[in-house]
């Protein structure tokens, strides 16, 4: 899934801002910084200055409106049926709370009663004990030990035994509580009374004994060879407790344990004894590794506190009455708060404080100074990130209200209970008999300070508090989110002797709601005061919490909160000035540009313990200098200096902008760096947590839809002059003191407005995207998440396991894509309908699961049904329906996937039509076609892009054809193996024949599409698979254009050129075909041999002689040229034949053979380069004849060489004779009518000479020449001339009468065949023969021994004479 570049840019902007606010939230000062411990590197104190405690009145200007810090939710009395049992009480009664299940309990002697404290119903009781109940506890069981119905274990102790009961509930959560009749465990106490019971979240049970020892009940599912199923272990004394008799323990000093508190986040346990001793334990994961970290006595605590504060009565530090663990969410470095009877809070840590390593370049303490107090003497250096607990160290002492110089409240007295929750300390004091007072000390309203400031509130209670615990809401998500913590008030249950009293510890969102309701809207000075007195970014976040709350949706409160957000959220501007004392100002509500730090709006005040003011001495315990402000700035204040702005001043975004980003950052804080899945591919975000996060995201999305980005960024815009006078503090700081002219300030303000609008647009887009991603995760959670992940490829699984939700929301959009694919495939694999899940995805993730995705999977479902359909008509209907759906969603479909499914269903037409539609919709203006038709110009980038896009779509057609071809090949291969196992492969021709049954149909369907580019795709495939016949069967003009372009681009490709002339010839373009054939014949290439060149010329001549070719002059000249080339080519063929005979013996001849095949040569080249150098006499004769060369001597010389070359070859006389006249007969047939190249007279004489020399049979020459159908009259004439010449050559050759013998044979042949002579020429020819015979007789008369010749001649004369009668 590729996001558009503009969207990616927006995401980059939003990500940068979110990361900045995320880090700001992570690095905000915690308790260690607020108490000054990190700045000093030593223990500190506070509570002596007036500003350490404030009431909520500082948030408002109107004193008539009283703001509540806590609110009573419900009050409920103890059920009457339980009170009835008080009449029968004998000796002991105690009460307490089970906040985990929303119930209170009461014991009366040996009976226990349990009821729901918010509605006083569902009363349960247990009376199965015979001894007095000393202590009660409720613990979660260990996983896998009991049946699932047992949700909790009720632990009851008596003086002699510990009883563990199983607790079950009805169908709905924590309703209809039932106690199991029989205990699951019963353990003896060894005569040690158990005063307190506490359990951990993982099911471990701890007991505090009156003997001062800490015990753990270890239990398991079954007994083993080495231990019981359940046993009690004394952690204080270890294994020795098993061997020491209990009566010996009475001689040791006893300090009974009064309280046990557990920090489940750190696996720490704290113990408070009756004498005020505090112990810290590292309980680890098993009793075998549990260890005591440290122990601090009441006297040690007092001494150390007095060393910090010497101006108060030391007695206030004595008698610790309550301990409250600080979880990892509450504080990072501080772990425990202890509260004394006078309300003094003592902050402890289990890690030592090392100045040099932990807090950077602060000045180290002298040896005499305290750096923390505790039992271990050695305090090794600790790492700054995750220090291992090593002891118990007092780091901060905070006095309660009433000790400041101008205190208006009384000091708390007789504190006997305390509870800490999210920055609020609740203390129960006894002011008068039978009535307690509730104190609330909260730091929530004072987030604007760099030191600990708390607001105080008091509320009278109806009776004496027996129990104090936080109410656990069943709907509360397990994973804490800063946003949900700020939105939902914590409820605390107080159990008094009158019943249960549930209060809410109100958050700042509740305070703003009170202000809006009391002011009846946002247009009031008190609302403005709220924004100005708070960190403005935080105030905007608070307003957003109200405006987006589901509780107040559609109400006036939500509307007023949105209006307040718009009115008092400020505007963006440029940071025009460089303040000399900028670090003493507060602009923490604004986000500055790069490399800038934030300053404070409110002036910080002196702290109880002086802190260094120099930047060099500021701590570096956490990143981000925006929170490391000097503690005592008043003495350092100097008059501000005016500075002229420069062009590179960073933008200061408005509080609205930063509030929105902070809101989203806190919303996603708990999942931002969390891995999406664990190693078992289970989602780390549960379905309930996912639903809650999704609800928050959708609420914000709705807010941004109602209040557009432009509205948010420009709501408070007024005329520029008025803008300068606004009471908005930071705008006044940034704009009011500048020396810039008004017009330039206006321009800068508008530029800042534009930048903020862009940033908010990015956030708006991110929120919408986040809604879709979390919606998708919610949908995935509602299915079998592990099964979905199993469907992924190993690469995708690895990517998913490495991804955090930050990656999922920002950079890993492909993860969402393949998860969707896996989900849909899961449905398709199970043959389940995808309509419902597709609809769900489309409604909730319209951009992640687009319309085309929906169509794709519906099409997949239809195609799967079509494959299984037996009815051809119904199958065709399904396929056509699928094609219609896909055409509507084109071109953004996963075309390849759908086409592959079409192919698997043998729906080839669908591939063609869908590809064509995708190409058409992607290029509606046919720019790509125009690019092709214009010859593909190199400078037309847009045209090339469209052309490439179309061709990419048509690639699917080629893949389809490949599939068909391969399928036929495989089928042929299988058939060949079944016939003959020795044949391993199928022949390509067989595959081609099989493919021809299907391919023509596809070709015809493809050619119906009017786009020439799909035709090109088809032609290329046919050409690549050597299906030339099918290609030439195409009659579309686009084929000719394709072939022409291909030839022009591949001038040496003979196959393409060959196809082009065939295309022209087939389509009656004979002239073009002839020209191409001519070019083919003349092409210099090793791929064309001479035989093919001659064939091309022959076809070219035939094309030009076709009747469709016009009789123009140019055509005639071209035809004559072709004929001449053909003649020369035939001569070259003879040269090649002769050269081939020599190639086996001569290397030069072999090279000449290649050259003769490589190209056509002219007649001169053939003679000079081949015929003459290699003595190819017949070829020379052919060349002379073809060129009409008129050089008788040269021609006679060639003939003589031919005759000599034949007779010079070895062999008998008969063989030579036959060989010679066979050659002469061949040459006569070729050149007999050629005139100059056939020197008849010379040929007769040469033959007669050779016959005489070689003693050929008498008269063989005339006999052979006559048999060659040569003109006998001309033959008589040439013999007559030779007789008349009477040369000596015959005598020299050894037969003086050889020529006369030949003449006798010539005349004899004439006389024997006289009937074949034309009667009009008969007398003339016979007369010439008589003259020759007479001449021969005359010669014979002159020579002796010629009687035989004379007799023969005379007989001839008589025979000739008879012919004339």
From Swiss-Prot:
Keywords, alphabetical: Chromosome, Cytoplasm, Membrane, mRNA transport, Nuclear pore complex, Nucleus, Protein transport, Translocation, Transport
Span list, region Required for binding to chromatin: 508-986
Null mutant phenotype: Embryonic lethal. RNAi-mediated knockdown results in failed nuclear import of phosphorylated Mad in response to activation of the dpp signaling cascade. RNAi-mediated knockdown results in altered karyosome morphology, in the reduction of Nup62 association with the nuclear envelope and its accumulation in the cytoplasm. RNAi-mediated knockdown of Nup62 in combination with Nup154 rescues the phenotype of the Nup62 knockdown restablishing correct kariosome morphology and chromatin detachment from the nuclear envelope.
Function: Component of the nuclear pore complex. Has a role in the organization of the inner nuclear membrane proteins at the nuclear envelope. In germ cells, plays a role in the nuclear localization of components of the dpp signaling pathways, such as Medea and phosphorylated Mad. Binds to chromatin, and together with Nup62 and Nup93-1, contributes to karyosome morphology and chromatin organization including attachment to the nuclear envelope in oocytes and nurse cells.
S-S pairs: none
An example Gene Ontology molecular-function term: chromatin binding
Residue numbers spanned by region Required for binding to Nup93-1 and anchoring to the nuclear pore complex: 1-508
High-level lineage: Eukaryota, Metazoa, Ecdysozoa, Arthropoda, Hexapoda
Alphabetical list of InterPro entries matching this protein: Nucleoporin_Nup133/Nup155_C, Nucleoporin_Nup133/Nup155_N, Nucleoporin_Nup155, Nucleoporin_Nup155_C_1, Nucleoporin_Nup155_C_2, Nucleoporin_Nup155_C_3
Protein name (Swiss-Prot/TrEMBL): Nuclear pore complex protein Nup154
Similarity remark: Belongs to the non-repetitive/WGA-negative nucleoporin family.
GO cellular component terms, semicolon-separated: chromosome; cytoplasm; nuclear envelope; nuclear membrane; nuclear periphery; nuclear pore; nuclear pore inner ring; nucleus
Subunit composition and interactions: Interacts (via N-terminus) with Nup93-1. Interacts with Nup35. Interacts with cup.
Subcellular location: Nucleus, Nuclear pore complex; Chromosome; Nucleus; Nucleus membrane
Primary localisation category: nucleus
Gene Ontology process terms (BP): actin filament organization; eye development; germ cell development; growth of a germarium-derived egg chamber; male meiotic nuclear division; mRNA transport; oocyte growth; oocyte growth in germarium-derived egg chamber
Membrane-protein topology: Peripheral membrane protein
Pfam family, one: Nucleoporin_C
């Amino acid at each position: 899934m590729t996001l558009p570049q503009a969207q990616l840019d927006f995401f980059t902007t939003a990500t940068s801002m979110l990361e900045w606010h995320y880090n700001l939230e992570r690095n905000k000062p915690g308790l260690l910084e607020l108490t000054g411990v990190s700045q000093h590197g030593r223990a500190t104190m506070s509570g002596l200055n007036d500003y350490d405690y404030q009431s909520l009145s500082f948030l408002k200007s109107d004193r008539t409106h009283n703001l509540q810090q806590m609110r009573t939710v419900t009050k409920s009395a103890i059920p009457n049926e339980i009170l009835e049992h008080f009449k029968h009480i004998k000796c002991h009664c105690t009460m307490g709370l089970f906040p985990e299940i929303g119930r209170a309990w009461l014991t009366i002697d040996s009976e226990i009663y349990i009821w729901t404290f918010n509605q006083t119903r569902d009363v349960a009781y247990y009376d199965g004990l015979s001894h007095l109940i000393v202590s009660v506890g409720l613990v979660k069981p260990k996983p896998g030990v009991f049946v699932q119905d047992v949700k909790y274990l009720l632990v009851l102790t008596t003086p002699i035994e510990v009883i563990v009961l199983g607790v079950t509930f009805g169908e709905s959560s924590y309703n209809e509580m039932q106690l199991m009749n029989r205990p699951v465990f019963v353990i003896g106490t060894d005569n040690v009374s158990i005063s307190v019971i506490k359990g951990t979240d993982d099911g471990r049970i701890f007991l505090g004994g009156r003997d001062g020892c800490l015990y753990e009940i270890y239990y398991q599912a079954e007994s083993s060879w080495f231990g019981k199923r359940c046993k009690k272990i004394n952690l204080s004394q270890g294994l020795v407790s098993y061997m020491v008799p209990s009566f010996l323990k009475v001689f040791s000093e006893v300090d009974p344990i009064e309280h046990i508190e557990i920090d489940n986040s750190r696996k720490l346990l704290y113990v408070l004894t009756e004498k005020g001793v505090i112990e810290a334990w590292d309980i680890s994961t098993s009793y075998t590794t549990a260890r005591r970290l440290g122990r601090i006595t009441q006297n040690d605590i007092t001494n150390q506190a007095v060393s910090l504060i010497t101006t108060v009565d030391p007695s206030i530090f004595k008698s610790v009455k309550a301990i409250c663990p600080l979880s990892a969410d509450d504080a990072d470095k501080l772990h425990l708060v202890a509260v004394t009877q006078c309300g003094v809070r003592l902050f402890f840590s289990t890690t030592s404080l090392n100045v040099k390593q932990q807090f950077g370049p602060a000045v180290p303490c002298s040896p005499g100074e305290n750096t923390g107090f505790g039992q271990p003497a050695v305090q090794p250096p600790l790492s700054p990130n995750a220090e291992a607990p090593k002891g118990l160290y007092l780091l901060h002492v905070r006095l309660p209200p009433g000790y400041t110089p101008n205190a208006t409240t009384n000091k708390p007295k007789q504190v006997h209970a305390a509870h800490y929750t999210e920055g609020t300390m609740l203390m129960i004091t006894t002011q008068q008999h039978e009535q307690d007072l509730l104190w609330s000390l909260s730091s929530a309203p004072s987030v604007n300070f760099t030191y600990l400031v708390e607001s105080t509130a008091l509320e009278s209670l109806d009776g004496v508090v027996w129990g104090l615990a936080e109410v656990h809401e069943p709907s509360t998500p397990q994973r804490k989110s800063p946003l949900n913590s700020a939105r939902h008030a914590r409820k605390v249950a107080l159990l008094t002797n009158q019943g249960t009293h549930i209060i809410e510890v109100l958050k700042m969102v509740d305070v703003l709601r009170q202000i809006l309701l009391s002011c009846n809207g946002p247009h009031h000075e008190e609302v403005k005061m709220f924004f100005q007195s708070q960190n403005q970014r935080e105030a905007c976040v608070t307003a957003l919490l109200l405006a987006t709350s589901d509780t107040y949706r559609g109400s006036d409160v939500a509307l007023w909160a949105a209006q307040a957000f718009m009115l008092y959220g400020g505007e963006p501007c440029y940071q025009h000035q460089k303040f000399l004392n900028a670090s003493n100002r507060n602009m923490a509500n604004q986000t500055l540009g790069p490399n800038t730090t934030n300053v404070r709006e409110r002036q910080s005040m002196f702290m109880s313990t002086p802190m260094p003011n120099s930047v060099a001495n500021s701590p570096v315990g956490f990143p981000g200098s925006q929170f490391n402000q000097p503690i005592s700035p008043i003495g350092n204040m100097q008059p501000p200096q005016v500075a002229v702005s420069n062009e590179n001043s960073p933008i200061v975004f408005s509080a609205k902008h930063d509030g929105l980003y902070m809101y989203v950052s806190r919303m996603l804080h708990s999942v931002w760096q969390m891995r999406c899945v664990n190693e078992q591919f289970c989602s780390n975000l549960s379905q309930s947590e996912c639903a809650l996060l999704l609800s928050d995201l959708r609420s914000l999305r709705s807010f941004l839809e109602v209040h557009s980005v432009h509205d948010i960024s420009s709501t408070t815009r007024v005329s520029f002059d008025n803008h300068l006078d606004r009471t908005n503090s930071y705008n006044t700081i940034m704009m009011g003191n500048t020396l810039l002219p008004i017009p330039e300030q206006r321009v800068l303000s508008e530029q800042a407005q534009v930048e903020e609008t862009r940033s908010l647009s990015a956030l708006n887009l991110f929120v919408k995207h986040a809604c879709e991603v979390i919606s998708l995760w919610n949908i995935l959670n509602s299915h079998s998440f592990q099964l979905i992940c199993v469907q992924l490829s190993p690469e995708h699984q690895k990517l998913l396991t490495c991804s955090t939700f930050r990656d999922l929301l920002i950079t890993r959009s492909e993860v969402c894509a393949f998860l969707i694919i896996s989900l849909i495939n899961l449905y398709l694999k199970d043959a389940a309908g995808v309509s419902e899940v597709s609809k769900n995805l489309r409604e909730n993730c319209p951009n992640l699961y687009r319309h085309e995705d929906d169509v794709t999977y519906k099409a997949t479902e239809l195609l799967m049904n079509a494959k299984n359909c037996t009815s051809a008509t119904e199958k065709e209907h399904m396929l056509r329906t699928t094609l219609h759906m896909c055409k509507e969603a084109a071109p953004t479909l996963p075309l390849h996937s759908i086409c592959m499914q079409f192919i698997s269903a043998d729906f080839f037409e669908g591939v063609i039509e869908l590809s064509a539609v995708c190409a058409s919709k992607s290029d509606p203006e046919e720019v790509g076609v125009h690019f092709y038709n214009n010859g593909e110009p190199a400078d037309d980038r847009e045209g090339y892009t469209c052309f490439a896009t179309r061709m990419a779509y048509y690639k699917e057609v080629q893949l389809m054809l490949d599939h068909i071809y391969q399928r036929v090949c495989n089928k042929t291969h299988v058939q060949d193996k079944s016939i003959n196992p020795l044949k391993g492969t199928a022949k390509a021709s067989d595959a081609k024949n099989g493919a021809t049954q299907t391919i023509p149909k596809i070709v015809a369907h493809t050619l119906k599409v009017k786009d020439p580019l799909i035709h090109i795709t088809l032609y290329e495939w046919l050409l690549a698979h050597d299906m030339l016949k099918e290609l030439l069967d195409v009659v579309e003009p686009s084929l000719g254009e394709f072939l022409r372009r291909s030839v022009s681009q591949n001038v040496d490709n003979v196959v393409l050129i060959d196809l082009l002339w065939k295309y022209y010839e087939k389509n009656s373009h004979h002239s073009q075909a002839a020209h191409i054939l001519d070019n083919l014949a003349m092409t210099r290439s090793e791929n064309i041999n001479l035989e093919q060149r001659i064939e091309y010329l022959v076809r070219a001549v035939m094309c030009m002689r076709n009747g469709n070719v016009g009789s123009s002059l140019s055509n005639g000249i071209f035809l004559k040229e072709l004929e001449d080339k053909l003649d020369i080519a035939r001569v070259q063929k003879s040269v090649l034949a002769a050269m081939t005979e020599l190639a086996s013996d001569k290397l030069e001849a072999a090279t000449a053979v290649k050259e003769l095949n490589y190209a056509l040569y002219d007649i001169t080249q053939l003679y000079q380069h081949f015929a003459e150098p290699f003595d190819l006499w017949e070829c020379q004769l052919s060349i002379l004849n073809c060129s009409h060369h008129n050089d008788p001597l040269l021609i006679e010389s060639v003939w003589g060489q031919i005759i000599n070359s034949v007779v010079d070859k070895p062999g008998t006389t008969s063989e030579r004779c036959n060989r010679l006249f066979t050659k002469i007969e061949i040459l006569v047939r070729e050149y007999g009518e050629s005139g100059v190249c056939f020197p008849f007279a010379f040929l007769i004489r040469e033959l007669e000479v050779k016959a005489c020399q070689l003693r050929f049979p008498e008269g063989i020459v005339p006999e052979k020449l006559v048999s060659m159908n040569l003109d006998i009259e001309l033959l008589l004439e040439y013999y007559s001339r030779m007789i008349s010449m009477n040369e000596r050559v015959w005598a020299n050759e050894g037969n003086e009468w050889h020529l006369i013998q030949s003449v006798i044979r010539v005349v004899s042949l004439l006389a024997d065949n006289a009937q074949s002579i034309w009667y009009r020429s008969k007398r003339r020819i016979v007369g010439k023969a008589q003259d020759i015979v007479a001449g021969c007789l005359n010669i014979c008369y002159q020579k002796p021994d010629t009687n035989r010749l004379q007799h023969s001649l005379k007989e001839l004369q008589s025979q000739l004479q008879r012919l004339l009668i």
